[in-house]
Amino acid sequence: MQLKAEYINFKYKKDKYILKDINLSVNSDEIVGILAPSGFGKTTLAKILAGYIKPEKGKVLLEGQNKIKKLFNPVQLIFQHPEKSVNPKWKMKKILNEAYEPSDQMIEAMGIKKEWLNRWPSELSGGELQRFCVLRALSPHTKFLIADEMTTMLDAITQAQIWKVVIKYCKENNIGLIVISHDKSLLDKVCHRIVNLEENHKEEIIENII
């Protein structure tokens, strides 16, 4: 399966274009990095790929077809700030089971403690909350996963644990993974190739990955 963006252009109202003629393709067996500093439209591109917003020009195709949102989006997006991605009026068990019920093995692998399931989002730390958001996105229906600065705000141990689970799951389930970050050292470690938005979409092939 392939997720493809063709000639994506986007600007906010009368501002200048933050995305101009972006072309990107990701296969279901790939890990592709998107590298750029703040202000280059990384998150906007992520939202377009996931169907949250529409480009001013261009299109996003899933297996050659215009991507249509169904009951569950096959392209899942994980944001940098997990507190903005959950319903504060729901307890964590309901949030986690919104799309599917993950196995006890997956819950344990993600480092989620059972007592957290009965807590409110406000009672968890950012790292604890992000574990739930990541696991929620790893549904059997997910075909492509977009990680937008997914672990930037987390400590090194939590980062390593989350990436280990995500990469293993994506490989085992043939899920395409798009890693969006300003941190090239992270992309060098986890990606097959990197697209640099700052350098005219220059592509770099990475030989050594986790």
Residue map of PLM features:
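Conserved structural motif at the start of ABC-family nucleotide-binding domains
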Residues: 3, 18-19
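The feature captures the beta-strand-to-loop junction immediately N-terminal to the Walker
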Residues: 35-37
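Helix-to-loop junction immediately C-terminal to a conserved catalytic motif
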Residues: 50
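Conserved ABC transporter NBD signature motif
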Residues: 58-71
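Q-loop/switch helix immediately C-terminal to the Walker
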Residues: 81, 88-102
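Conserved ABC ATPase signature
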Residues: 120-124, 128
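Hydrophobic anchor residue at the start of the ABC signature
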Residues: 134, 146
